[in-house]
Amino acid sequence: AGHLVHMPAHIYIRTGKYHEGTLANIRAVKSDEEYINQCNQQGFYPLSYYPHNYHFLWATATLEGDSKTAIDAALKTSQKPPDSMMSVCGYETLQHFAAIPLYAFVTFGKWNEILEFEKPKDDRPYIVAIWHYARSMAHIAKNNLTQAEVEIVNLESFRNNETIDSLLIWGFNSAGILVDISCEVAQGE
């Protein structure tokens, strides 16, 4: 039921009604939590649909400029998928969920939080690449240009990475393209 409660947010985000999208996702999270707890739901639904409500809440709250709600949702998005599932075929999107706090911290200029963020496991190259991106942005903002350059070089090393290029978010968005965009943004700064 939570997924149906969430779906209007797709319309709201496309029509600029970001706050309504935020409210729809808050209701969807509550609905899914009740459903998962009552039914002891396992499998695809709690791994993907439920965290997608938080993921979309991050997006709508970001677009309406609500940093507190956006960052809280980003952190919850990253906490929902179990680490053991991130490399399972078909569940690669969970790696993107784990990177969402880094995107949120960059968006809202939370430079100290980025620099305190623990380095992801090396067997998650997409998340590690985004970690280097976020760190490069933090160092640029703090005018630590030598350290920023080191992070950009590290980030660039993830371009044309077969593992990242083959990781598809929701089955159609290439994580490799997101890494390419991150490289361009960091270089542009």
Predicted segments — roles?
Residues 2-5, 44-47, 51, 95, ...:
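Start-of-helix signal in alpha-solenoid helical-repeat scaffolds, especially tetratricopeptide repeats
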Residues 1-4, 8-14, 18-35:
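Hydrophobic, small-residue-rich alpha-helical packing segments that form membrane-like cores
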Residues 140-143, 148-151, 175-189:
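C-terminal substrate/ligand-recognition segments
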Residues 7, 14, 56, 100, ...:
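"A position-specific structural signal for the A-helix of alpha-solenoid helical repeats
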Residues 1, 43-44, 78-89, 117-126, ...:
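Solenoid-like repeat scaffolds
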Residues 20-31, 65-80, 109-122, 145-160:
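Alpha-helical repeat scaffolds
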